[in-house]
Amino acid sequence: MRQRPCRIVGCMNERAPVVAIVYNPTKFNDSTQWKKSAHQICQQEGWADPLLLATTRDDPGQGMTREAVRQDVDLVCAAGGDGTVRQVATVLAGTRTPMGIIGMGTGNILARNLDLPIDDFDKGLRTALRGRRRTIDLGWVSFDGATEQCFTAIIGMGFDADTMANTSEAGKAEYGWIAYIVAALRYLVQPGFRATVTIDGKVCEAQRARSILLCNCGLLPAGIRLVPSARIDDARLDSLALAPH
């Protein structure tokens, strides 16, 4: 019997791409409205219904991101502040799954440095669904031998860390990023600490500092450029020591 060549012209099981949205529920006032918008936007952009995964106090995002990867989604969006972004990035680092950022937090440092929409869920989601991919750097840190964690923007010790840790959620909800300034005032009189920094195996001279920062990017809220030389894709971190005088 003579066989005829077969040419495949289509596939019946092709599916629309799927986005998972790992969101911090404390950053949304009306969960019903934004979830409705998420479904509508995905439909308009040719995507399937989104997979919505809420973070919790016990799991601020890593478990939800692993579930999204397990379900083989095409994109994972972090919807929240820099904390949610960091948790999602920790899991996605080194994978082939791209990450989108919907900046709904207080500082939104990474979103600002990538020139992404801030405090606009609809625009942020559309940008993520339509946007081009870009590779950025991540920093990794461990404390006292604990498991490494990634940071996407800036990590600090001393004055900076005290300020971040002691800014209340209520203050951030009411005043936005200005709440960090209010919290910082109580630590301005701290005498600082003595630190020795080692960079690429070279030990720098010990110095007294109020805060030491490692920066993957340099743009802060209100357009403040803390570290003008910092670039998010230059394969290096910029260090900054703030002296107590």
Language model features: what each stretch is:
Residues R2-V76, R126:
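ATP/NTP phosphate-donor binding region
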Residues V22, Q44-E45, T55, A93-P98, ...:
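Catalytic core of DAGKc-family lipid kinases
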Residues P25, A79-G81, I102-G105, N216:
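Glycine-rich beta-strand-to-loop/alpha-helix junction loops that act as flexible
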Residues P25-K27, F143, I155-A161, L213-L219, ...:
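Glycine-rich beta-alpha junction loops
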Residues F28-T32, I136, P221:
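Short N-terminal binding/cap micro-motifs at the start of the first secondary-structure element
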Residues G61, G83-V88, I109, I136:
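Short glycine/serine/threonine-rich phosphate/pyrophosphate-binding segments
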Residues D74-V91, T95:
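Conserved beta-strand-loop-alpha-helix hinge of the TIR/SEFIR fold
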Residues G192, I199-K202, R208-H245:
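Internal anion-binding site segments
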